[in-house]
From Swiss-Prot:
One Pfam family, short name: UxuA
Organism: Salmonella gallinarum (strain 287/91 / NCTC 13346)
Keyword terms, alphabetized: Iron, Lyase, Manganese
Pathway as given in its UniProt record: Carbohydrate metabolism; pentose and glucuronate interconversion
Gene name of this polypeptide: uxuA
GO biological process, one term: D-glucuronate catabolic process
Protein name: Mannonate dehydratase
């Protein structure tokens, strides 16, 4: 695997020098300062690429080129935004950047309820609490029809939880859910959030798939022509939330994508922490079935709690993800490619490290502190080395 590291640009508290010292050789970044839908010019791409290369690193993957909400709802200027997206892909290819991670999650990107969940060892992790999320939906957002998405027991627990919350607790929960997490290009006030949710009132899973298919049929041929590989990121969490459909959550969704546009430019990001939240997702089977189309991987683990819809981010080698078997399947795919004459390594980044040690005293991007990811990268690197030596050394 090619070892990479997500970097949020010049304002990231983790520097490129830190990235290089961590042992990564590739950088995963994006032009976050450019508004959603606007073209990434060659000049802007080259400026960022030069910064990365001056640090002795390579810009390996774009994460992400965001998809404008008009495209997801198939309203407004969606065709203009698609044309801009096509041009951005062409510009990236002209600059020698050929792997693009993206997602098709409506309104919100990845979602958590607690950004400072304290683990028994004193480090902090990200957590999604199903009951707190229900309390937000039912008693703060007050989304019409939200009761239908929860069991009677969850509704009762949410009411009890809400009754114990201070105003500060309510504000923090609201902020965590709607203000935008790292990598998300959108942040909302509560009223703006309600308005954006309303734009999806007539969009179910089938309709959102129609809109995604329209996007894929417009984008993938351009990506194919210029040599860019599109790697869709799964929904996080991988199930419907807030009354919104989710359409990249299961192996069936992956198969639908391939059948919709059967081009090798139409590929996947294997995010084990997103897919792995669902107990019915067999990560190794996903890799084996769609290995040739996996162009990027995020390696992390989550741990489901008593309510299986509640989870927190575990250490990289613990939790519900069998990281050994996942890494072994990825390495096997790389060796399959090598046997066919390709030296195409899969870029991997350690995803969402715990906030720990000295980082507990620093201001960090949630999930993206340095030391936790350094630990995760070192652990995964060791797993890969052991697999390479045990199964593939001559």
């Amino acid at each position: 695997m090619k070892q990479t590291w997500r970097w949020y640009g010049p304002n990231d508290p983790v520097t490129l020098s830190d990235v290089r010292q961590a042992g990564a050789t590739g950088v995963v970044t994006a032009l976050h300062h450019i508004p959603n839908g606007e073209i990434w010019s060659i000049d802007e791409i080259q400026k960022r690429k030069a910064i990365v290369e001056e640090a002795g690193l390579e810009w390996s993957v774009v994460e992400s080129v965001p998809i404008h909400e008009d495209i997801k709802t198939h309203t407004g200027q969606y065709d203009l935004w698609i044309k801009n997206y096509q041009q951005t892909l062409s510009n990236l290819a002209q600059c020698g950047i050929y792997t693009v991670c993206y997602n098709f999650m409506p309104v919100l990107d990845w979602t958590r309820t607690d950004l400072e969940y304290v683990l028994p060892d004193g480090s902090k992790a990200l957590r999604f609490d199903q009951i707190e999320f229900a309390a937000f939906e039912l008693h703060i957002l007050k989304r019409p029809g939200a009761e239908a998405d929860y069991t009677a027991e969850e509704i009762a627990q949410a009411e009890r939880r809400f009754a114990t919350m201070s105003e500060e607790d309510k504000a923090r929960l609201t902020r965590n859910i709607i203000a935008g997490l790292p990598g998300a290009e959108e942040g909302y006030t509560l009223d703006q959030f309600r308005q954006h949710l309303a734009t999806y009132k007539d969009i179910d899973k089938a309709k959102l798939r129609e809109h995604f298919a329209y996007f894929l049929k417009a984008i993938i041929p351009v990506a194919d022509e210029v040599g860019v590989r599109m790697a869709v990121h799964p929904d996080d969490p991988p199930r419907p939330i807030l009354g919104l459909p989710r359409i990249v959550s299961t192996i069936e969704d992956m198969q639908w994508m391939v059948e919709t546009v059967n081009s090798m430019a139409n590929g996947f990001t294997m995010c084990t922490g997103s897919y792995g939240v669902r107990a019915d997702n067999d990560l190794v089977d996903m890799i084996k079935q769609f290995g040739p189309r996996i162009y990027f991987t995020h390696l992390r683990s989550t741990l489901r709690e008593e309510n299986p819809k509640t989870f927190h981010e575990a250490a990289h080698l613990h939790g519900d993800v069998d990281m050994y078997e996942v890494v072994k399947a990825i390495v096997e795919e790389e060796h399959r490619r090598k046997a066919e004459g390709s030296d195409d390594l899969i870029p991997m980044r350690p995803d969402h490290g715990h906030q720990m040690l000295d980082d507990l005293k620093k201001k960090t991007n949630p999930g993206y502190s340095a030391i936790g990811r350094l630990k995760g990268l070192a652990e995964v690197r060791g797993v890969e080395l052991a697999i390479q030596r045990a199964f593939f050394s001559k």
